[in-house]
Amino acid sequence: MNKKKRYEILSILSRNNPEPKIELFFSSDFELLLSVILSAQSTDFIVNKTTKILFKIANTPETIFLLGLERLKNYIKDIGLYNTKALNIIRTSFIILTKYNSIVPNNRIELESLPGVGRKTANIILNILFKKKTIAVDTHVFRVCNRTNFAKGKNVKIVEEKLIKVVPSIFKLNFHSWFILHGRYICTARKIKCNICLIFKLCEFKQKIF
């Protein structure tokens, strides 16, 4: 895909949704961090359903840590990999409480040092909370980038590296949100909705439905 097409696609998505919002519910930096950790291999719907109850009981590093591992597991048991996630959350809560004075760190190195926080999670936190022009590549973003030929790659790392190079700076802040929403509701894994796609004419997917 050429530079002009990419710019047109992003312009269309920008006009349609100037201020895209993440679909995870949160009211603090720490709540978002926990929600993103929980969202790995899960859906935002399940995470929101879970945190709606959990955050009424505990929603700070101190209260989560005091809740304890077993009680936390009970609250998040409907989420995939809940045993591992519970342990990571307890450990991360303790580190943020004791090392960072209950404040979520705002740089990649410190974020990725937290249990349960990888590059994708760090990118989301940096982007949403701290307005950094990072691009998180999840399954939706990966699929849309490859399918449309916006930025092809065999893995998320390659796609992210390409996106950093080809996405104009003015669009980088919202890129992740636009593409994840497009992948979640339009360019879905199954039953692709080409008939209502805003970027249909610019898409280079050879099997798109006319």
Swiss-Prot record:
Q: Which CDD domains match?
A: ENDO3c
SMART domains linked? ENDO3c
Q: Which family does the similarity line name?
A: Belongs to the Nth/MutY family.
Keywords of the record: 4Fe-4S, DNA damage, DNA repair, DNA-binding, Glycosidase, Hydrolase, Iron, Iron-sulfur, Lyase, Metal-binding
Is rRNA-binding there in the keyword field?
Answer: no
Matching PANTHER family: A/G-SPECIFIC ADENINE GLYCOSYLASE/ENDONUCLEASE III, ENDONUCLEASE III
Question: What does the note accompanying the cofactor annotation read?
Answer: Binds 1 [4Fe-4S] cluster.
Q: Where is the HhH domain?
A: 108-127
One biological-process term from Gene Ontology? base-excision repair, AP site formation
Q: State its cofactor.
A: [4Fe-4S] cluster
InterPro entries cross-referenced by the UniProt entry: DNA_glycosylase, Endonuclease-III-like_CS2, HhH-GPD_domain, HhH_base_excis_C, HhH_motif, Nth
What species is this protein from? Buchnera aphidicola subsp. Acyrthosiphon pisum (strain APS) (Acyrthosiphon pisum symbiotic bacterium)
Q: What Pfam families does the record tag this protein with?
A: HHH, HhH-GPD
Q: What does this protein do?
A: DNA repair enzyme that has both DNA N-glycosylase activity and AP-lyase activity. The DNA N-glycosylase activity releases various damaged pyrimidines from DNA by cleaving the N-glycosidic bond, leaving an AP (apurinic/apyrimidinic) site. The AP-lyase activity cleaves the phosphodiester bond 3' to the AP site by a beta-elimination, leaving a 3'-terminal unsaturated sugar and a product with a terminal 5'-phosphate.
User: What GO annotations for molecular function exist for this entry?
Assistant: 4 iron, 4 sulfur cluster binding; class I DNA-(apurinic or apyrimidinic site) endonuclease activity; DNA binding; DNA N-glycosylase activity; metal ion binding
Q: Where does [4Fe-4S] cluster bind?
A: 187, 194, 197, 203
Q: Which reaction does it catalyse?
A: 2'-deoxyribonucleotide-(2'-deoxyribose 5'-phosphate)-2'-deoxyribonucleotide-DNA = a 3'-end 2'-deoxyribonucleotide-(2,3-dehydro-2,3-deoxyribose 5'-phosphate)-DNA + a 5'-end 5'-phospho-2'-deoxyribonucleoside-DNA + H(+)
State the source organism's domain of life. Bacteria
The protein depicted here goes by the name Endonuclease III
